[in-house]
């Protein structure tokens, strides 16, 4: 690089002197072609040079709550598309992102804790709400309170499947002897869920999730009635068939729609072994018979779709006269008689009255026979415990719980369950021996001692008291000393 400087004075004054300075720079050209080198696109930074900035971990990017059941080896998520599995866990863990509210049933909260060091449980705010207060009171006869939790920092929750508060869930939660288990629903907006158990909704979240109460349909829809009439094998009367869901004790159900996550609880076995909630996927035109008390939830398309897939079912009674005929709703063929003109004589009037009386007498006995068969069927299903069965027609997704809060009615309730039973001990014989004395006899403690006798070695003996044994040993020693 060459540098030439020229300074030329222009004017000289006593008060001011101005100069002009010219600079010229000469530089050789540089090749601007970028080589395909990986080192050019790399940047390195020493972490110690960055201060006053916290590292962004993966949990900071949490946008939706994460539901995870504890104590279950399998997955416990049931989506609206049909993929799900059973659940056997009674505790639900939830990781909640910032500014996302979570609603849990009153009295079911176990623990609140932060996610590592960036969270603070002091920022968690709580609010008690009663959603659908009047509808739940009218349709279900219960009121459920839910605790709204929200925080500006991420936090985690532990939720119990049972509620400590009395009366939550309509009086069907904490008092029963059955275990409760969680199952998680992920709603993507394509399919809605009808929850028939009023105590099943334990926790939910989602800004676009809608939870409403609707009345249970008493009769099936005309669409389902027409489809049943098209079935040639079915000879039942489809006029005003009942769904079997409606009862004066239970008038409504909960409809879940929109997008969000829901944690449901169902009744499991009292022993706690195995799974308690199962998912059944029905394809098109598939049918299944289930007890309505075990039906936890079913997929629907809106609030008026429940009457398009469920029909009340009663097990038919086998007729003793004709065992092969198991259908009780077969109609007898009706003969249509054309009216005839007769002469209005006295004899013809008597014959006409006798025929009318005979026809009326036959109709009377047909009505009695019809209601007698219906009474027999109802009585049989009631005594057998099959009075609550319904038929579900696919395509549907069903959630079934293995037990219910309602015990089976029938002859089983006659046997007292709180009666203490005697202990039964197995033997090698074909009969069993009842140990009656075990409940009255008191246990005794036996003491063992060892004596070494010549020619016999160590001899083990048991005694109730050591005093006799000690006296006998002392007497033996005295005799030995005297003999010496």
UniProtKB/Swiss-Prot annotation:
UniProt GO BP = inner mitochondrial membrane organization
Mind telling me where the transit peptide is?
Answer: 1-30
Q: Where in the cell is it found?
A: Mitochondrion
Matching Pfam families, A to Z? AIM24
Keywords of the record, alphabetical order, are: Mitochondrion, Transit peptide
Please give the chief subcellular localization of this protein.
mitochondrion
Q: Which InterPro entries match?
A: AIM24 (IPR002838), AIM24_sf (IPR036983)
Query: Under the cellular component aspect of Gene Ontology, which terms does the record hold?
Result: mitochondrial inner membrane
Q: Which family does it belong to?
A: Belongs to the AIM24 family.
List, alphabetically, the PANTHER family matched: ALTERED INHERITANCE OF MITOCHONDRIA PROTEIN 24, MITOCHONDRIAL
Name recorded for this polypeptide: Altered inheritance of mitochondria protein 24, mitochondrial
In its UniProt entry, the species of origin is given as Candida albicans (strain SC5314 / ATCC MYA-2876)
Gene name on record?
Answer: AIM24
């Amino acid at each position: 690089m060459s540098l030439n400087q020229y300074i030329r004075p222009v004017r000289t004054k006593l008060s001011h002197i101005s100069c002009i300075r010219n600079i010229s720079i000469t530089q050789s050209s540089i090749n601007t072609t970028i080589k395909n080198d990986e080192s050019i696109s790399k940047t390195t930074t020493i972490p110690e040079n960055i201060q006053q900035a916290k590292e962004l971990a993966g949990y900071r990017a949490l946008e939706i709550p994460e539901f995870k059941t504890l104590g279950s080896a399998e997955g416990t998520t049931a989506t609206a598309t049909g993929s799900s599995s059973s659940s056997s866990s009674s505790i639900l863990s939830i990781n909640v992102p910032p500014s996302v509210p979570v609603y849990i049933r009153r009295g079911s909260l176990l623990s609140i804790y932060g996610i590592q060091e960036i969270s603070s449980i002091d920022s968690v705010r709580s609010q008690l709400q009663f959603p659908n207060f009047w509808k739940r009171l009218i349709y279900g006869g219960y009121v459920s309170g839910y605790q709204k939790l929200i925080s500006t920092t991420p936090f985690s929750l532990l939720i119990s499947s049972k509620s400590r508060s009395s009366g939550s869930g309509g009086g069907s939660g904490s008092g029963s002897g059955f275990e409760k288990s969680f199952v998680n629903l992920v709603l993507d907006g394509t399919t809605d869920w009808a929850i028939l158990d009023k105590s099943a909704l334990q926790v939910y979240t989602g800004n676009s999730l809608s939870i409403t109460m609707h009345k249970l349909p008493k009769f099936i829809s005309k669409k389902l009635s027409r489809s049943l009439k098209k079935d040639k094998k079915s000879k039942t009367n489809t006029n005003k068939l009942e769904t079997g869901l409606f009862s004066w004790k239970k008038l409504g159900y909960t409809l879940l729609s929109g997008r969000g996550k829901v944690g449901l609880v169902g009744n499991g076995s009292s022993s706690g072994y195995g799974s308690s909630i199962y998912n059944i996927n029905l394809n098109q035109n598939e049918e299944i018979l289930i007890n309505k008390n075990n039906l936890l939830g079913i997929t629907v398309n809106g609030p008026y779709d429940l009457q398009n897939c469920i029909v009340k079912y009663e097990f038919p009674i086998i007729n003793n006269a004709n065992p092969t005929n198991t259908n009780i709703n077969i109609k007898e063929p009706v003969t249509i008689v054309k009216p005839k003109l007769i002469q209005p004589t006295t004899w013809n009037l008597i014959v006409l009255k006798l025929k009318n009386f005979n026809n009326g007498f036959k109709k009377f006995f047909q009505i009695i026979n019809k209601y007698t068969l219906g009474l027999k069927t109802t009585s049989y299903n009631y005594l057998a415990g099959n009075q609550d069965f319904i038929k579900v027609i696919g395509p549907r997704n069903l959630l079934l719980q293995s037990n219910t809060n309602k015990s089976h009615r029938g002859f089983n309730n006659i046997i007292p369950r709180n009666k203490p039973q005697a202990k039964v001990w197995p033997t090698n014989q074909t009969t069993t021996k009842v140990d009656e004395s075990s409940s009255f006899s008191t246990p005794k403690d036996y003491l063992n001692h060892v004596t070494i006798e010549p020619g016999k070695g160590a001899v083990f003996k048991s005694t109730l008291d050591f005093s006799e044994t000690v006296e006998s040993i002392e007497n033996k020693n005295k005799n030995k000393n005297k003999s010496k």
